[in-house]
Amino acid sequence: MRKALALPLLAIFLGGCASNPADRDISGTWINQVAIDAAAKGGPLREALQAYGPNLEWDVNTKASQARYTNGFENVEGRLLGEKSGAWKVDFYGSSASELKRDGGQLQQAASENEPEQVFDRAQIPVPEGAPIGASFERALYSAYMGGSWTIANGQGEGSTVQFQADGQVSGLPGADRYALCLAGDCASMSSTNDNMWLQLNGQGNAYIFARKGKELEIFQAVNTALADEMPQYTPGERKWLLEKQ
Protein backbone atom coordinates (compact mmCIF):
# COMPACT_ATOMS: atom_id res chain seq x y z
CA MET A 1 0.00 0.00 0.00
CA ARG A 2 2.82 2.36 0.83
CA LYS A 3 4.43 1.68 -2.56
CA ALA A 4 1.13 2.34 -4.31
CA LEU A 5 0.91 5.75 -2.65
CA ALA A 6 4.49 6.70 -3.47
CA LEU A 7 3.99 7.39 -7.19
CA PRO A 8 0.87 9.58 -6.82
CA LEU A 9 2.62 11.63 -4.13
CA LEU A 10 5.68 12.01 -6.35
CA ALA A 11 3.49 13.15 -9.24
CA ILE A 12 1.86 15.77 -7.03
CA PHE A 13 5.26 17.00 -5.86
CA LEU A 14 6.64 17.27 -9.41
CA GLY A 15 3.46 18.94 -10.60
CA GLY A 16 3.89 21.57 -7.92
CA CYS A 17 7.45 22.22 -9.10
CA ALA A 18 6.31 22.59 -12.70
CA SER A 19 3.93 25.38 -11.67
CA ASN A 20 6.55 27.27 -9.70
CA PRO A 21 5.19 30.78 -8.93
CA ALA A 22 8.58 32.23 -9.91
CA ASP A 23 7.94 31.09 -13.48
CA ARG A 24 4.83 33.29 -13.55
CA ASP A 25 6.34 36.28 -11.73
CA ILE A 26 6.17 39.44 -13.84
CA SER A 27 7.82 41.78 -11.32
CA GLY A 28 10.81 43.81 -12.44
CA THR A 29 11.92 45.92 -15.39
CA TRP A 30 11.27 44.61 -18.90
CA ILE A 31 12.54 46.18 -22.14
CA ASN A 32 11.62 45.85 -25.80
CA GLN A 33 14.71 43.87 -26.83
CA VAL A 34 13.13 42.95 -30.17
CA ALA A 35 13.10 46.61 -31.23
CA ILE A 36 16.68 47.06 -30.02
CA ASP A 37 17.86 44.02 -31.99
CA ALA A 38 16.13 45.32 -35.12
CA ALA A 39 17.76 48.75 -34.76
CA ALA A 40 21.18 47.20 -34.07
CA LYS A 41 21.21 45.77 -37.59
CA GLY A 42 22.19 49.28 -38.68
CA GLY A 43 19.10 50.79 -40.25
CA PRO A 44 16.87 53.77 -39.40
CA LEU A 45 16.20 53.95 -35.67
CA ARG A 46 12.61 55.14 -35.50
CA GLU A 47 11.65 52.74 -38.28
CA ALA A 48 12.68 49.85 -36.03
CA LEU A 49 10.93 51.34 -32.99
CA GLN A 50 7.70 51.85 -34.92
CA ALA A 51 7.81 48.34 -36.38
CA TYR A 52 8.20 46.63 -33.00
CA GLY A 53 6.66 49.19 -30.66
CA PRO A 54 4.99 51.24 -29.52
CA ASN A 55 5.90 50.42 -25.92
CA LEU A 56 9.56 50.38 -24.95
CA GLU A 57 9.68 49.42 -21.27
CA TRP A 58 7.50 48.01 -18.50
CA ASP A 59 8.19 48.31 -14.77
CA VAL A 60 6.04 45.97 -12.66
CA ASN A 61 5.70 45.63 -8.89
CA THR A 62 3.24 42.84 -8.08
CA LYS A 63 3.58 43.30 -4.30
CA ALA A 64 2.46 46.91 -4.59
CA SER A 65 -0.08 46.09 -7.35
CA GLN A 66 1.57 48.67 -9.60
CA ALA A 67 2.60 48.60 -13.26
CA ARG A 68 3.81 51.35 -15.52
CA TYR A 69 5.19 51.64 -19.04
CA THR A 70 6.74 54.15 -21.39
CA ASN A 71 6.55 54.51 -25.15
CA GLY A 72 9.34 57.07 -25.24
CA PHE A 73 6.88 59.95 -25.09
CA GLU A 74 4.36 59.15 -22.37
CA ASN A 75 4.94 57.50 -18.99
CA VAL A 76 1.72 55.70 -18.04
CA GLU A 77 0.95 54.30 -14.59
CA GLY A 78 -1.61 51.58 -13.91
CA ARG A 79 -2.92 49.24 -11.22
CA LEU A 80 -2.53 45.46 -11.23
CA LEU A 81 -5.90 43.82 -10.60
CA GLY A 82 -4.52 40.36 -9.86
CA GLU A 83 -3.54 37.15 -11.58
CA LYS A 84 -5.96 34.81 -13.35
CA SER A 85 -4.72 31.71 -15.17
CA GLY A 86 -1.21 33.15 -15.31
CA ALA A 87 -2.29 36.51 -16.75
CA TRP A 88 -2.29 39.87 -14.98
CA LYS A 89 -4.69 42.64 -15.90
CA VAL A 90 -3.41 46.21 -15.68
CA ASP A 91 -6.09 48.86 -15.27
CA PHE A 92 -5.20 52.42 -16.25
CA TYR A 93 -7.79 53.93 -13.96
CA GLY A 94 -10.76 53.25 -16.20
CA SER A 95 -9.36 54.66 -19.43
CA SER A 96 -7.98 51.37 -20.80
CA ALA A 97 -6.46 48.05 -19.76
CA SER A 98 -3.60 45.74 -20.72
CA GLU A 99 -2.93 42.07 -20.05
CA LEU A 100 0.52 40.83 -19.10
CA LYS A 101 1.83 37.31 -18.62
CA ARG A 102 5.07 35.36 -18.60
CA ASP A 103 6.01 33.42 -21.71
CA GLY A 104 9.10 31.50 -20.66
CA GLY A 105 11.77 34.09 -19.94
CA GLN A 106 9.83 36.91 -21.57
CA LEU A 107 6.94 39.18 -20.64
CA GLN A 108 4.09 39.16 -23.12
CA GLN A 109 1.72 42.07 -23.55
CA ALA A 110 -1.48 40.81 -25.16
CA ALA A 111 -2.88 42.54 -28.24
CA SER A 112 -5.69 45.03 -27.63
CA GLU A 113 -7.87 47.34 -29.69
CA ASN A 114 -5.20 50.02 -29.54
CA GLU A 115 -1.92 48.09 -29.50
CA PRO A 116 -0.40 44.95 -31.06
CA GLU A 117 1.01 42.04 -29.11
CA GLN A 118 4.51 42.77 -27.82
CA VAL A 119 7.20 40.82 -25.98
CA PHE A 120 9.75 42.16 -23.50
CA ASP A 121 12.95 40.81 -21.95
CA ARG A 122 14.34 41.47 -18.50
CA ALA A 123 16.67 44.47 -18.41
CA GLN A 124 20.33 43.45 -18.01
CA ILE A 125 22.21 46.77 -17.95
CA PRO A 126 22.09 48.43 -14.50
CA VAL A 127 20.85 52.01 -14.16
CA PRO A 128 21.37 54.48 -11.28
CA GLU A 129 18.97 54.21 -8.36
CA GLY A 130 15.99 56.48 -8.92
CA ALA A 131 16.47 56.62 -12.70
CA PRO A 132 13.23 57.40 -14.58
CA ILE A 133 11.32 54.68 -16.37
CA GLY A 134 12.78 54.16 -19.83
CA ALA A 135 16.37 54.46 -18.64
CA SER A 136 16.95 50.71 -18.89
CA PHE A 137 15.68 50.58 -22.48
CA GLU A 138 17.65 53.69 -23.39
CA ARG A 139 20.94 52.32 -22.06
CA ALA A 140 20.46 48.98 -23.79
CA LEU A 141 19.59 50.74 -27.05
CA TYR A 142 22.52 53.15 -26.87
CA SER A 143 24.89 50.26 -26.22
CA ALA A 144 23.57 48.17 -29.12
CA TYR A 145 22.97 50.94 -31.66
CA MET A 146 25.77 53.40 -30.92
CA GLY A 147 28.29 51.28 -29.01
CA GLY A 148 31.81 50.44 -30.10
CA SER A 149 34.40 52.70 -31.70
CA TRP A 150 33.74 54.97 -34.68
CA THR A 151 36.26 56.77 -36.89
CA ILE A 152 35.57 60.24 -38.26
CA ALA A 153 35.95 59.57 -42.00
CA ASN A 154 34.92 63.08 -42.98
CA GLY A 155 34.35 66.29 -41.07
CA GLN A 156 35.98 68.17 -38.21
CA GLY A 157 38.35 65.89 -36.34
CA GLU A 158 38.87 63.59 -39.32
CA GLY A 159 40.74 60.45 -38.31
CA SER A 160 39.76 60.68 -34.65
CA THR A 161 38.03 57.89 -32.77
CA VAL A 162 34.54 58.55 -31.40
CA GLN A 163 32.84 56.54 -28.68
CA PHE A 164 29.20 56.84 -27.66
CA GLN A 165 28.56 55.50 -24.16
CA ALA A 166 25.40 53.83 -22.90
CA ASP A 167 24.89 56.61 -20.31
CA GLY A 168 24.75 59.35 -22.97
CA GLN A 169 28.38 60.49 -22.83
CA VAL A 170 30.34 60.87 -26.06
CA SER A 171 34.08 61.31 -26.52
CA GLY A 172 36.13 62.22 -29.58
CA LEU A 173 33.39 64.16 -31.38
CA PRO A 174 34.40 67.84 -31.60
CA GLY A 175 32.06 70.17 -29.73
CA ALA A 176 30.12 67.47 -27.88
CA ASP A 177 30.36 65.64 -24.57
CA ARG A 178 26.82 64.24 -24.39
CA TYR A 179 24.22 62.95 -26.83
CA ALA A 180 20.61 61.77 -26.82
CA LEU A 181 18.70 59.90 -29.51
CA CYS A 182 15.14 60.95 -30.31
CA LEU A 183 12.82 57.99 -29.75
CA ALA A 184 9.32 59.48 -29.99
CA GLY A 185 7.19 62.51 -29.19
CA ASP A 186 7.74 66.15 -30.16
CA CYS A 187 11.35 65.67 -31.22
CA ALA A 188 10.18 63.00 -33.68
CA SER A 189 7.40 65.22 -35.04
CA MET A 190 9.90 68.00 -35.67
CA SER A 191 12.03 65.95 -38.05
CA SER A 192 9.34 64.18 -40.11
CA THR A 193 10.68 60.77 -41.17
CA ASN A 194 14.30 61.63 -40.37
CA ASP A 195 16.11 60.36 -37.29
CA ASN A 196 17.55 63.06 -35.06
CA MET A 197 19.80 63.37 -32.03
CA TRP A 198 20.78 66.03 -29.53
CA LEU A 199 24.46 66.91 -29.16
CA GLN A 200 25.65 69.19 -26.40
CA LEU A 201 28.80 70.51 -24.74
CA ASN A 202 28.79 71.82 -21.17
CA GLY A 203 25.00 71.82 -21.08
CA GLN A 204 24.49 73.75 -24.35
CA GLY A 205 23.53 71.99 -27.55
CA ASN A 206 21.51 71.60 -30.72
CA ALA A 207 19.47 69.06 -32.65
CA TYR A 208 21.09 67.20 -35.55
CA ILE A 209 19.67 64.93 -38.22
CA PHE A 210 21.40 61.58 -38.62
CA ALA A 211 21.23 58.66 -41.03
CA ARG A 212 22.50 55.18 -40.18
CA LYS A 213 23.41 52.84 -43.04
CA GLY A 214 25.13 49.72 -41.78
CA LYS A 215 28.53 50.72 -40.43
CA GLU A 216 28.18 54.33 -41.60
CA LEU A 217 26.64 57.14 -39.57
CA GLU A 218 26.06 60.52 -41.22
CA ILE A 219 25.31 63.51 -38.99
CA PHE A 220 23.77 66.60 -40.60
CA GLN A 221 23.08 70.10 -39.42
CA ALA A 222 19.35 70.43 -38.67
CA VAL A 223 17.81 73.30 -40.66
CA ASN A 224 14.59 74.72 -39.22
CA THR A 225 12.13 75.53 -42.02
CA ALA A 226 9.28 76.66 -39.73
CA LEU A 227 8.24 80.22 -39.02
CA ALA A 228 9.17 81.85 -35.72
CA ASP A 229 5.74 81.20 -34.14
CA GLU A 230 5.50 77.59 -35.35
CA MET A 231 6.81 74.31 -33.99
CA PRO A 232 10.30 73.74 -35.42
CA GLN A 233 10.50 71.56 -38.52
CA TYR A 234 13.96 70.19 -39.20
CA THR A 235 15.37 69.00 -42.50
CA PRO A 236 18.92 67.80 -43.23
CA GLY A 237 21.36 70.59 -44.01
CA GLU A 238 25.13 70.46 -44.44
CA ARG A 239 26.73 67.17 -43.49
CA LYS A 240 28.91 67.74 -40.43
CA TRP A 241 30.40 64.26 -40.00
CA LEU A 242 30.64 60.89 -41.62
CA LEU A 243 31.50 58.23 -39.04
CA GLU A 244 32.53 54.68 -39.86
CA LYS A 245 32.30 51.90 -37.30
CA GLN A 246 35.59 50.17 -36.67
Predicted regions and their residues:
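Contiguous, well-ordered beta-strand patches that form the walls/edges
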Residues: 36-44, 50-106, 154-160, 170-245
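Short, structured interface segments
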Residues: 107-139
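Bacterial N-terminal signal peptides
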Residues: 6-15
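N-terminal helix-cap/turn-to-beta initiation motif at the start of protein domains
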Residues: 17-31, 129-151
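Positively charged n-region of N-terminal signal peptides that target proteins for export
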Residues: 1-4
